[in-house]
Amino acid sequence: MAVNPLDFLKNMSSVKNNIDNIKKEISKITVCGKAGSNIVAIEMDGEFNVKKVSINKEFFDDLDNDAFEQMIKSALNDAVSKVKEEIKLKTMGVLPFGM
């Protein structure tokens, strides 16, 4: 069965439009990763840029350095996981298999 090059190009144009729309949607994503019962919260966008770091100062003085560093790491990893999940949800069924 021969493939019509014009049909292929039309499909590629559609794929490009889908990718452009997905990029716009991803740029709108904002998530908040949290750790230590909200002692540390990190806001991140869909491009994995940290937009805000919040620290509940009420608990800050009671933490040692290692515990505080671990909470920051956990909150950051939580935010990254949430961005990845949002991207997965927004791209599911939109891109052709394997992209």
Curated annotation (Swiss-Prot):
<protein>
    <recommendedName>
        <fullName>Nucleoid-associated protein EbfC</fullName>
    </recommendedName>
</protein>
<dbReference type="InterPro" id="IPR004401">
    <property type="entry name" value="YbaB/EbfC"/>
</dbReference>
<dbReference type="GO" id="GO:0043590">
    <property type="term" value="C:bacterial nucleoid"/>
</dbReference>
<comment type="similarity">
    <text>Belongs to the YbaB/EbfC family.</text>
</comment>
<dbReference type="GO" id="GO:0003677">
    <property type="term" value="F:DNA binding"/>
</dbReference>
<keyword id="KW-0238">DNA-binding</keyword>
<dbReference type="GO" id="GO:0005737">
    <property type="term" value="C:cytoplasm"/>
</dbReference>
<comment type="subunit">
    <text>Homodimer.</text>
</comment>
<comment type="function">
    <text>Binds to DNA and alters its conformation. May be involved in regulation of gene expression, nucleoid organization and DNA protection.</text>
</comment>
<dbReference type="InterPro" id="IPR036894">
    <property type="entry name" value="YbaB-like_sf"/>
</dbReference>
<dbReference type="Pfam" id="PF02575">
    <property type="entry name" value="YbaB_DNA_bd"/>
</dbReference>
<keyword id="KW-0963">Cytoplasm</keyword>
